[in-house]
Amino acid sequence: MKKFQSMMAVVLVALMAFAVQSCGSDDDNNQQYKLTVTLDITDKGPLTDAQCDAMRSDAQKGSTVADHPTDASAETATMRAAQAISEALVLYKDTYGSAKFTYTLVCTKVSGNKQIITYYVEYNAGSINTYNNKNAK
């Protein structure tokens, strides 16, 4: 379990660095974004390949740039981070197995109109629930 926790910590640091870099700034309109990634995995049992594939597919659907074309950088960063985390979860499945996890991505524009993009995936006991909420404030 310690090896699992240390590996998860290393991957989380790498994902955070990736996410912050991806969601750094939008050169087109000089908007700054902040991306927060939260990942929680409980080691309970193996995911099937089909479940991992479904999770990856859901993560790839996390970007709907057409809904907010001016926020394309935030949308793209959110999708890329979701894909990166999904790949990491597949690695955990191959190495340790996991039956319950959740992760949340939040990308917030910190100048101009607030645009909060939240992508949330929950896998628990054989079912996958996905939420992709966008709230303009």
Ranges and model annotations:
Residues V121-K137:
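Short, low-complexity, Pro/Ser/Thr/Gly-rich segments in the mature regions of secreted, periplasmic
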Residues L35-L39, Y103-C107, Y119-V121:
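Hydrophobic beta-strand residues in large extracellular and virion-surface proteins
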Residues Y96-K114:
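A short amphipathic beta-strand at an alpha->beta junction
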Residues M16-D40:
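Bacterial Sec-dependent N-terminal signal peptides
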